[in-house]
């Protein structure tokens, strides 16, 4: 599953999807059981404009860790990929956005974003091999 992070959390669409995905398998017992009978690996990919240090300072990791914990509880295993300091706009000149260093954003997009995309691809390959 994937979502951009807006205002510190995943989009409403992703939250709604996850609630509908998870709820039918919940068991309210002391063991935190699940009605999902198989074990599958799940992945969560988040993109955000915040830099890594900003993400940590604002506590994004805590809320995202809860989602990973619930996915692990229900489906067996989960991992997250956090992609930070991404583009918010294709053209920064069209928006009031003077807090961003556009040259740094462009450099990061050119140098780091392809690596993040490769990490996401590699995650998918690992999952396919495990499930295969």
Regions found by a protein language model. Give the residues of each.
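Glycine-rich phosphate/pyrophosphate-binding loop and the adjoining helix
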Residues: 67-132
């Amino acid at each position: 599953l994937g979502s951009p992070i807006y205002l510190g959390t995943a989009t409403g669409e992703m939250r709604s999807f996850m609630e509908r995905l998870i709820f039918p398998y919940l068991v309210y017992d002391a063991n935190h059981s699940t009605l999902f009978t198989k074990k599958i690996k799940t992945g969560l990919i988040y993109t955000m404009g915040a830099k890594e240090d900003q993400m940590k300072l604002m506590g994004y990791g805590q809320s995202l860790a809860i989602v990973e914990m619930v996915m692990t509880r229900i489906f067996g295993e989960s991992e997250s990929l956090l992609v930070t300091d991404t583009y918010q706009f294709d053209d920064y000149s069209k928006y009031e956005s003077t807090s961003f260093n556009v040259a740094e954003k462009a450099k990061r997009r050119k140098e780091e974003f392809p690596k993040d995309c490769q990490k996401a691809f590699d995650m998918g390959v690992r999952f396919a091999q495990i499930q295969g």
